Amino acid sequence: MLTEQQRRELDWEKTDGLMPVIVQHAVSGEVLMLGYMNPEALDKTIESGKVTFFSRTKQRLWTKGETSGNFLNVVNIAPDCDNDTLLVLANPIGPTCHKGTSSCFGDTAHQWLFLYQLEQLLAERKSADPETSYTAKLYASGTKRIAQKVGEEGVETALAATVHDRFELTNEASDLMYHLLVLLQDQDLDLTTVIENLRKRHQ
């Protein structure tokens, strides 16, 4: 998040009091939208944790999602090298664009975004009816059963690779990834935590 020194160094005069703000998906890196903030909008964004702009058409502060419920939850805010533009990393609740797409720039989503969306769906399935949802049934069966499924799918993935069956390997790898995500959710872990750990190992 912005430090006090970074906030003091922002060049509001250069931008006539309205600073362009690029909002980027904190997980996938997809550019979600462009908006403008004045100092008050920035203050409210930091205080509320939800992206708030100054609307040039409404001439007032406008929290993204205040009508639709599709909020942008702030993860981090950073200035550019000239202190006249802000980059906001956020996790969106629902589609960002009023047209129903994830980005106001059209279908620019990276394939990794689907994993994030799947992860959110799997988290929601924790409270679903086990009678109507396979995922909910897995959660209800307990950690040992979920772990067993991960092991089974891992073996099947390896076997498909040993016989060079690319079709089956793709299917089994998909099953393995799905069950691994369920296991992570069962343990209150997410894919971002795993990715960060991989990054640390790579350094």
UniProtKB/Swiss-Prot annotation:
Query: Where is the segment annotated Phosphoribosyl-ATP pyrophosphohydrolase?
Result: 115-203
- Catalytic activity from the UniProt record: 1-(5-phospho-beta-D-ribosyl)-ATP + H2O = 1-(5-phospho-beta-D-ribosyl)-5'-AMP + diphosphate + H(+); 1-(5-phospho-beta-D-ribosyl)-5'-AMP + H2O = 1-(5-phospho-beta-D-ribosyl)-5-[(5-phospho-beta-D-ribosylamino)methylideneamino]imidazole-4-carboxamide
Record-annotated disulphide pairs: none
Named in its record, the pathway it takes part in is: Amino-acid biosynthesis; L-histidine biosynthesis; L-histidine from 5-phospho-alpha-D-ribose 1-diphosphate: step 2/9; Amino-acid biosynthesis; L-histidine biosynthesis; L-histidine from 5-phospho-alpha-D-ribose 1-diphosphate: step 3/9
Q: Which UniProt keywords apply?
A: Amino-acid biosynthesis, ATP-binding, Cytoplasm, Histidine biosynthesis, Hydrolase, Multifunctional enzyme, Nucleotide-binding
Instruction: State where it is primarily located.
Output: cytoplasm
Enzyme Commission number(s): 3.5.4.19, 3.6.1.31
Alphabetized GO MF terms? ATP binding; phosphoribosyl-AMP cyclohydrolase activity; phosphoribosyl-ATP diphosphatase activity
Q: What class of enzyme is it?
A: hydrolase
**Record's superkingdom?**
Bacteria
Keyword presence, Isomerase: no
Q: Where is this region: Phosphoribosyl-AMP cyclohydrolase?
A: 1-114
Pfam families assigned to the protein according to its UniProt record, in alphabetical order: PRA-CH, PRA-PH
List the subcellular locations.
Cytoplasm
GO cellular component terms, semicolon-separated: cytoplasm
What the entry lists under HAMAP family is as follows: HisE, HisIE
User: Hey, which family's this protein in?
Assistant: In the N-terminal section; belongs to the PRA-CH family.
**What is this protein identified as?**
Histidine biosynthesis bifunctional protein HisIE
Per the UniProt entry, what species is this protein from, by scientific name? Shigella sonnei (strain Ss046)
Per the UniProt record, the lineage of the source organism begins with:
Bacteria, Pseudomonadati, Pseudomonadota, Gammaproteobacteria, Enterobacterales
